[in-house]
A protein has these predicted regions:
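Short hinge/gating elements
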Residues: 1, 85-91, 200-220, 313-321, ...
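Metal- or metallocofactor-binding catalytic centers and their adjacent structured scaffolds
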Residues: 275-327
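Basic, low-complexity terminal or inter-domain segments flanking catalytic cores
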Residues: 2-3, 98, 145-146, 242, ...
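Glycine-centered, phosphate/nucleic-acid-interacting loop/turn motifs that mediate DNA/RNA or nucleotide
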Residues: 359-360, 583
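Structured, non-catalytic alpha/beta "coupling" segments that mediate domain-domain communication
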Residues: 31-71, 227-274, 393, 453-502, ...
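Intrinsically disordered, low-complexity regulatory segments
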Residues: 1-193, 197, 287-290, 499-500, ...
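C-terminal or mid-to-C-terminal helical accessory/interaction module adjacent to the motor/catalytic core
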Residues: 103, 110, 158-255, 317
Length: 798
């Protein structure tokens, strides 16, 4: 028997439909038939000599690294004296609710002659197959115990799957991919587990900050990527907070020529700034006041005689512009996310995954490559006329170069991972138009981007005029389109032009010649430094992708460019989601704001560069990538992590650095937040009016009580009397089974100086629903506190 391990059920169905000769069921019917069974079996003489084939899926990541308490019971409790937590050997465990499927996988692996890794072809897909193979015992550190091959396909079309099965690969490269991913996971576990515990414990010890461990009110956590990603938002918040409106002046000129009027911008002299923040830097032609420019105009070394000008240079060039690169996950998420109003995660897990897995219309969308192989280029070349018709063009519009352009085609860079392009499945125009709008927009965008390979380059005529006025020179640039080339593909999709066709500030110019004289009018133009805008989902993603480009170290800059920023295109959306769930940021109307908890974490960690700056990611990712290349090892990489955690390194390690960071941070601005957070974590809703202690609601109780009014079961059985008598029912209404339970906010309002709740709507009364305010009072006759209602006559129903 041959067992294929797929990553998801959709893959299993795609493989089965491509390989099973006698299948008559649709994908939906197959899904319904086999989803509970967990696998599909069949025979086909065309594959593996007719041997029984089992295709089973892993339900994504089926295994996870064990928790600290799985190694040692002492590690379950959060204590500083147990840090750093470093297991002798890292081990996996089966995720909850996936044990049943894992047992099936192991059973089929045990019975099979050969196993085929048929998961996604990225490092996480390889990690899934590798870790399951280790856990089931068919693979260990010395190598495979059975024959293991790899199915390497980047589109789920029958043709490509059939070709891939006939050309199964060795697993050597995928093992290196998997070890890289495994090493990253272990390193992130070590850093996150130790730093999160240390920071939480230190903040609780020094300032009393305590958050509910459920995370519902926020979470104190540290991660190699997510903390640095948070700092991108923190730095933008600082820039907004510290922004000082600034006005400056630049020099413009209007020139009168016999053939008309044109404008020019002053070309700054090669001199440095003499004062201010830019002192010593090359002058950019700006002045802090209009008066400064008025004086400079009179200076014969700058301008001098400013009434007349002479055209000293006039150049006309025919220029070409390449189209954008083919789509990779980064670019498709940014451009189409902005167009469709979706987050990066939604673009990937929505239209992209459906077009790939279900519709089979685009290649693997998680690819980070924007190259294709020569073989795929030739296939797309044959498909180009049919693809062109789907977006309103014909074969006559296409141009097929004699040889592929290396800008798109690279066998070395496009062989394993292809750019996102259409597959060999070409739907009819009617089928495309029948697609849901989101899928149609994404699919047509991929077609257009791909067809740019078979359209001429955009050509334009650029005219540059240099006009001499006294000692000064002014530059004027104009552009005239000559051949729209590939840009015609986007003329009917204006919303896609942003980021594809750059808007030029140049313009068509009047006809002039060198040595023509002109009349000049010089005008200092007022400019304003703009306040930095708040990050949105798309600008934050771009900041993640370009993080580290402003580092001082040229080598680190090169590394950050190579690794394409923080995280991966597939994980960045999830990182933002996690930051929101952790209550570090608040998203309002698409804009990202730093929360008080986010501010507190950033203020604490701002000087700990490993946790706040992109250099760490650059160095880590460079070292990790060498594992996949075979030039580095997991052992060597983790040795450095252990040193940072304090092994054989008593100073300048993680724990010591965090202790110092908490000690030197001023938490005075966060006192109100800290008090509120502690109250929530302790379940405190307010202060007892009798003794001043905390009032709480236990579990699903309908009674709010002073903490000194609460007795344990043992105390009640022993006949103990509460120290404080304060408690009250927290339900309102007059119909027994329809009473409203007050929210925590409403209970807090009752116990605050405010003394009553906001308006509570639709309270059930004997004569129908009504609206009322609730307030707390003492019933002297009964000797108890109770909630009373003040009916709102203006809004209550009659």
């Amino acid at each position: 028997m041959i067992t294929y391990l797929a990553e998801k059920r959709d893959q299993v169905i795609a493989y089965y439909m491509a390989l099973a000769a006698d299948n008559t069921l649709s994908a939906t019917q197959l899904d319904e038939k086999y989803k509970k069974q967990g696998y599909i079996q069949f025979k086909n003489a065309a594959y593996h000599n007719g041997e029984l084939i089992t295709i089973i899926w892993a339900q994504g990541h089926m295994l996870e690294l064990k928790e600290p308490e799985d190694y040692k019971a002492d590690w379950k409790e959060w204590r500083l004296d147990t840090l750093p937590i470093i297991p002798e050997k890292f081990e996996y465990k089966v995720m909850t609710q996936k044990e049943w499927q894992f047992k099936k996988v192991k059973d089929f692996f045990d019975k099979s002659r050969m196993i085929v890794w048929a998961t996604d072809i990225d490092r996480e897909g390889s990690h899934i197959a590798y870790s399951i193979s280790l856990m089931t015992g068919i693979l260990d550190q010395e190598g495979p115990k059975k024959m293991i091959k790899s199915l390497w396909v980047d589109e789920l079309t029958p043709t490509k799957i059939q070709e891939g099965v006939k050309k199964l690969r060795e697993i050597d490269y995928r093992v290196l991919q998997a070890i890289e991913a495994q090493t990253r996971a272990i390193a992130d576990w070590l850093l996150g587990m130790n730093a999160s515990r240390a920071l939480s414990l230190l903040l609780e010890d020094k300032i009393g900050l305590k958050l509910d461990r459920s995370g519902k009110d926020g979470k104190i956590a540290v991660g190699r990527i997510k903390t640095v990603a948070l700092f991108l938002i923190y730095l933008r918040e600082l820039a907004i907070r510290d922004f000082v409106p600034t006005t400056y002046w630049e020099l413009e000129a209007t020139f009168e020529h016999p053939n008309g009027i044109y404008k020019g911008n002053y070309v700054p002299l090669d001199i440095p700034y003499s004062k201010g923040d830019k002192k010593g830097e090359p002058w950019e032609g700006d002045c802090p006041t209009r008066e400064d420019w008025e004086k400079l105009i009179q200076n014969p070394k700058i301008i001098g005689d400013s009434n007349k000008g002479v055209i000293v240079e006039h150049e006309v060039e025919l220029k070409e512009k390449r189209p954008p690169r083919l789509y990779c996950l980064d670019s498709i998420q940014e451009e189409l996310g902005k167009l469709l109003g979706l987050t990066a995660k939604e673009v990937l897990e929505g239209p992209c995954q459906e077009l790939y897995e279900v519709r089979k219309l685009i290649t693997y969308p998680r690819s980070l490559s924007f190259y294709i192989s020569r073989e795929r280029y030739e296939t797309l070349k044959q498909q180009a006329p049919a693809l062109a018709r789907l977006v309103g063009f014909s074969e006559e519009d296409l141009v097929f170069p004699e040889r592929p352009d290396g800008f798109f085609v690279n066998d070395k860079k496009g062989a394993n991972h292809s750019a996102v392009v259409p597959t060999t499945v070409i739907p009819t125009e009617e089928e495309v138009e029948a697609l849901p709008d989101t899928l149609k927009i994404v699919y047509k965008a991929v077609i257009r981007r791909t067809l740019t390979m078979f359209f001429p380059k955009y050509q334009y005529e650029q005219t540059t005029i240099i006009t001499q006025v006294g000692a000064g020179k002014f530059r004027t640039v104009g552009q005239v389109p000559k051949n729209p080339g590939w840009q015609v593909l986007f003329q009917d999709s204006a919303s896609l032009l942003d980021g594809v066709i750059e808007e030029s500030e140049a313009r068509d110019l009047i006809k002039v010649q060198t040595n023509d004289t002109v009349t000049s009018h010089l005008v200092p133009a007022e400019r304003h430094v703009k306040k930095p805008p708040r990050h949105t989902n798309s600008t934050w993603l771009r900041a993640m992708r370009t993080a580290g480009r402003d580092l001082d170290d040229e080598e680190l800059i090169a590394i950050m460019k190579q690794i394409k920023g923080l995280g991966t295109a597939a994980t960045r959306g999830a990182i933002l989601d996690e930051i929101v769930v952790n209550k570090w940021v608040i998203v309002k109307q698409g804009k990202i704001y730093l929360s008080e908890l986010g501010w507190l974490i950033c203020e604490t960690l701002k000087d700990e560069r490993v946790l706040s700056q992109p250099e760490t990611t650059a160095i880590w990712e460079q070292s990790l990538s060498k594992i996949a290349e075979g030039t580095n090892t997991q052992e060597k990489f983790l040795r450095n992590i252990y040193r940072y955690l304090g092994i054989e390194n008593p100073h300048n390690n993680l724990i010591e650095n965090l202790i110092n960071a908490v000690d030197r941070t001023d938490y005075t601005p966060f006192q109100d937040f800290i008090e509120q957070a502690v109250a929530k974590a302790d379940g405190k809703l307010g202060n007892c009016p009798l003794c001043g202690k905390a009032v709480k609601v236990l579990g699903k109780s309908k009674v709010a009580q002073c903490e000194d009014n609460i007795l344990s079961k043992e105390e009640r059985e022993a006949g103990a009397t509460p120290v404080c008598s304060f408690n009250f029912w927290i339900t309102v209404g007059f119909i027994k089974d329809k009473k409203k339970t007050l929210t925590k906010k409403q209970i807090s309002d009752l116990l605050s100086d405010k003394g009553r709740t906001n308006l509570i709507k639709n309270i059930e009364g004997k004569y129908g629903p009504f609206d009322a305010y609730a307030y707390l009072s003492f019933n002297e006759e009964k000797g108890i506190y109770q909630v009373n209602l003040e009916v709102d006559k203006a809004t209550s129903k009659k």
